[in-house]
Amino acid sequence: MTGKSPEVIPHTPVVQDLRAAREIFWINPHYRATKEFKEAQFGISLSDIHDAEERLRRFAPYLAKAFPETQPAQGLIESPIVPIKRMQSYLESRYGVQIPGDIWLKCDHQLPISGSIKARGGIYEVLKHAEETLIKQGLLTREDDYARLKDSSFRDVLSHYKIAVGSTGNLGLSIGVMGAELGFKVTVHMSADAKGWKKALLRSKGVEVIEYTSDYSKAVEEGRRQAEGDSRCHFIDDENSRDLFLGYAVAGLRLKEQLEKLNRKVDADHPLFVYLPCGVGGGPGGVTFGLKQVFQEHVHCFFAEPTHSPCMVLGLATGLHDGIAVQDIGLDNKTEADGLAVGRASRFVGKIMAGLLSGAFTVEDAELFRLLQALDHAEGIQCEPSALAGMAGPARLLLCKEGLQYIREHRLEEGLKRGTHLIWATGGSLVPVEVMKDYLSRGK
């Protein structure tokens, strides 16, 4: 992460709209509907994703013992996909557009252990670090039954090691809960945007929470700096972590299985459109990478960001990646979507997404609350504000000339009628009842 402001900021129409905090829909001019992925291009391959999936399966017996809520899925951390027909009708009415195809919800707000998409990457990296530490000490082999890790002797060993992370909330929750359960001493550096209940939950698990009055980037920077001087401290770097990225990418393999079980095809005649909330980029970037590996040119991924924190679309649209922050164009990086309150995108993720991401759009906070309330009313599903960022995606795609041009260019007009729109809901099941009541009241 450079942390530097650019000397010259491009004055393109999209940057001007972002500067004015207007809602935009941006199509990536560098998107390539490629069938092939060269490992040298990304430094990450499909075999790396399979390796991550195998590691999660090795840990499944342990997770089933440590977290009973994972037992229905035999210790796998996974969420269902559900059709949301009533919400689709609401979106068509609200935005005044017919949406061909079916809208489904990917329920990562229900993920066990930490209740958000961050359970995928955050928990994976903690598990990998624990495995490597114990194997190095000769206390574990990959052939062992990992259920034995619940034994207190392993906790005693890992209690001599530390894990640190910078977070706006959900990543810290997933790493804190998992790390503390394994016995690690965990420190979460939290930005000013982090919700009080998330800090309280972490502290109740014995996690050290260090609060900052500044934003996410500062929390990460401080966490990284403090960890550098301690050889026993593993810093989980949300801006640059390959392991976090791979943990998220496993979702691509899992989604393929889920869609097959539901007899929902993904091919040239049945395109898949996926709408993902985006903060620094690791979660949606990893998921997108996994999806593109599995479905190739038949999946079309779009990131959704708050109008006041559009760091990824700003980095991609200017080509500056982490060389520009939203503050450089006069935005305050203040949003109720705490998981998306990031001013400077990950360069690591931005570079990989440069040719894989179909586009991105921004959403006003007030609209997030309206959609949050509507989802509860239509489907009885409750999510936190960040999780609603992608909800308007199918309508927004069809309402702008750029989106319609994208559909024509990729010959999707007919396929769209048989296609699937998947809204990725990123968090919400751990939100306290009183906080959720407040969210719902703000959407009326």
Swiss-Prot record:
Question: Could you tell me the keywords of this UniProt record?
Answer: Lyase, Pyridoxal phosphate
Could you tell me which residues carry N6-(pyridoxal phosphate)lysine?
Answer: K118
Q: Would the keyword Mitochondrion be found if you checked this record's keyword annotation?
A: no
What is the E.C. number?
Answer: 4.3.1.18
Protein name per the record: Probable D-serine dehydratase
Q: Which reaction does it catalyse?
A: D-serine = pyruvate + NH4(+)
What GO biological process term is on the record, naming one? isoleucine biosynthetic process
Entry superkingdom: Bacteria
Q: Which family does it belong to?
A: Belongs to the serine/threonine dehydratase family. DsdA subfamily.
User: Pfam families under this entry?
Assistant: PALP (PF00291)
Species assigned in the record: Desulfitobacterium hafniense (strain Y51)
* Gene it is expressed from: dsdA
Keyword Amino-acid biosynthesis in record: no
Q: Which cofactor does it need?
A: pyridoxal 5'-phosphate
User: What HAMAP family does this protein's entry cite?
Assistant: D_Ser_dehydrat (MF_01030)
